[in-house]
């Protein structure tokens, strides 16, 4: 084996093994208990929505309010990178986007915490949800 091959072969193996060892990072709309955080209208003004939960499974998104009323829609994966995942969204005949990412916080004492964030952007409103990282 030449010196060139002695260097290239281990580098190639490292690259391949790094890809094989990747685990699920949780950046997906599915598999989380999404709870309502806040909402704004298209002008950026806060909306007073009842408490909502959001569930996503197999391309179907369901929003449920505190009275048990539901809205359903569909989503499809559009783009994924290391920091977030973007979906096309249709909810009760409105089209928009859904974005899943991680929000990091630093408190006054310097302590840090993180949570998953789901942002539903529709023409008339944007709704923010959160989910624990431990899920």
Which positions does each model-derived feature cover?
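Short, solvent-exposed coil/turn segments at beta-strand boundaries
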Residues: 52-61, 103-117
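Tryptophan-anchored aromatic micro-motifs
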Residues: 25-46, 75
């Amino acid at each position: 084996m030449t010196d060139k091959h002695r260097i290239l072969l281990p580098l190639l193996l490292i690259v391949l093994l790094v890809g094989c060892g990747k685990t699920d990072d949780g950046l997906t709309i599915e598999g989380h208990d999404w709870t309502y955080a806040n909402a704004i209208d298209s002008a950026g003004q806060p909306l007073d929505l009842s408490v909502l939960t959001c569930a996503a499974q197999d391309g179907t998104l369901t929003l449920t309010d505190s009275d048990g009323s539901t809205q359903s829609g569909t989503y499809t994966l559009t783009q994924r990178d290391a920091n977030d995942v973007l979906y096309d969204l249709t909810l009760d005949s409105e089209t928009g986007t859904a974005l899943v990412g991680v929000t990091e916080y630093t408190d006054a004492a310097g302590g840090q915490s993180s949570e998953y964030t789901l942002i539903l952007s529709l023409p008339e409103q944007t709704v923010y949800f959160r989910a624990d990282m431990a899920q």
